[in-house]
């Protein structure tokens, strides 16, 4: 059965023609089961979506453990019969909760990508501007930007700093701070200058090297901006849910962890 409206509707019609009470049991397999469960639930069936591990460990008492779609279907049916009275009923999630959970899944994926891209940029800078990522300790901004990343977008090679006089770099750094909205410090400018002049890049200062660093920075900045946007959207979605104040009052829960807890656990008010 393909996941089209016509074929799933035909499946619902065939199930309705069966004698006796019919319950539909399916494994929770990513998002693959979602359209089937949603349509059959809407058609009035008792639908139960069970954890795949519960079914996998059920009835493994055969010496031969072949795995085919037919055998899996029989195994699911037997599991459903044995747990008929305790099968959890599938209830479609509210739109807000569904979108919050989806946003969090995407947030997790982008976080992994961001870590990979950040490590890649640091590795490149180790050959062009060693320890450039250690020049600043400022936390990321709300839009996802980080000071050290913005800095190396302009001063991508240590020669971009030590190739200037101390006075010229200080003036250029002050102009850069003003452009990007960072606070300027004369002492910090001198520290950066001393650090850059105490390093050397094994990668030559060429257009190719600049291209490599700029592309790595561009990808990282794009991913960081996407993460910041997702974080803001998760905060907005979570704040519209009734359990939000309860979660946010928990010890150690902040604006980042709170929406994540709600996305994973759901309405915590059901626990007593």
What are the residue ranges of the model-derived segments?
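A detector of single, family-specific signature residues
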Residues: 1-272
